[in-house]
Amino acid sequence: MNMTELKGALIGCGFFAVNQMHAWKDVKGAGIAAICDRDPKRLKLVGDQFGIERRYGDAAALFADGGFDFVDIATTVQSHRALVEMAAAHKVPAICQKPFAKSLSDAKAMVRTCENADIPLMVHENFRWQTPIQAVKAVLESGAIGEPFWGRFSFRSGFDVFSGQPYLAEGERFIIEDLGIHTLDIARFILGDVATLTARTKRVNPKIKGEDVATILLDHQNGATSIVDVSYATKLGTEPFPETLIDIDGTQGTIRLSQGYRLEVTGPNGMTISDASPQLLSWASRPWHNIQESVLAIQQHWTDRLSSGGETSTSGADNLKTFALVEAAYESAANGRTVDIGAML
C-alpha cells in the first residue's frame, strides 16, 4: 500500500468478506490495513490469505489504536448499530453490509448518528452496481424507450444458498430481507422512489423457517407500476442464479434483460440486442462473478467519493428508502393491506 492510499479496516471475516478483501486489493486509491473478527480461526485465515499484519479480536481495541481512514463493517446485522456508532464516536467514515439494521428505527438512528458526527456512511448495497443493471439504467436514461410506465424485477432460482450460509434457514425472515432487499433497491434505482407497496409471501421449502417466495407490487412516485418477484423455490431447466431479470415498458419501446445477460432494446428505430455480461475478475468464480464484480464497483465508488467529498449512491440516507420497502413488504404480507411508504420515512 503506498502512502497516498486511503487505509481501511475490515470488521468481520466471514463468508462474504473474502470477496470484499479481494476487491480492496483491486481498488485504486485504497487498501485494507487492519482486520477484526471475534473468531481467531477466521482472523488467521483471512489475515494470512491477504497478508494483513494488524489483527484484532475486539472492535473497541481496533478503534482505540486507529491508524485508518475508514471502516468496512462486514459482520451480521446484530452488531451493525453498535459498530456504526463506534465508528461515529471515533469520527471514522463507515461502510456497512446489508441488511443495514434490525429495524427501520435502528437504521434511522444510525444515519442520524453519522450525520451528527459529520462522517460519510454507505450501505454495501452492491446489486445496483452490477454491469447488466447499470446497462439497463443507461438505456433508460438515454431516452431510447421514452417514459417508463411498467417494470418487472425478477430473481427466481432453485440454488442452494443454505449450504454456504446455513443461518439463512434459521431466521423468521428470509428471502425479502436477504435477497429481496437488493431487488427492491434495483426497482428504486431504475424507476425511482416508491409511494405504496403491496406484498404476498409463501414458504415452499418445509426445512426452513422463513419465506422463500415473495411477490411485491410497487406504485412508484412517478406513476410507474412495477413487480418485484423473488424465489428460492423455483426449479428451472437452466439455473439463472444469481441473475436479476428485468422487463421495462416505456412509452416509446421496451427493455428486456433476460437470462445469460442478453439485453434487448426495442425503440422507434427497431430492436438492438447486446451482451451485458459482467467481467470475470481474476479472483472471481462463476456464477458469482456478477456479484463479485459489483463488489469491486461499489468499493471503488466509495473510495472515489471519500477522496472527492461527494455523497455515495447508496448512502445511509438513501438506503433508508430501500430499507423501508423491506419493512413494508413484511407488514403488507402479514396484514394483507397496502402500505404507504412516505408515512414510514
Swiss-Prot record:
GO terms for molecular function: metal ion binding; nucleotide binding; oxidoreductase activity. Pathway: Carbohydrate metabolism. Disulfide bonds: none annotated. Mg(2+) binds at residues 24-25, 27, 30. It catalyses: D-apiofuranose + NAD(+) = D-apionolactone + NADH + H(+). Substrate binds at residues 98, 165, 178, 182, 232. Involved in catabolism of D-apiose. Catalyzes oxidation of D-apiose to D-apionolactone. This is D-apiose dehydrogenase. It comes from Rhizobium rhizogenes (strain K84 / ATCC BAA-868).
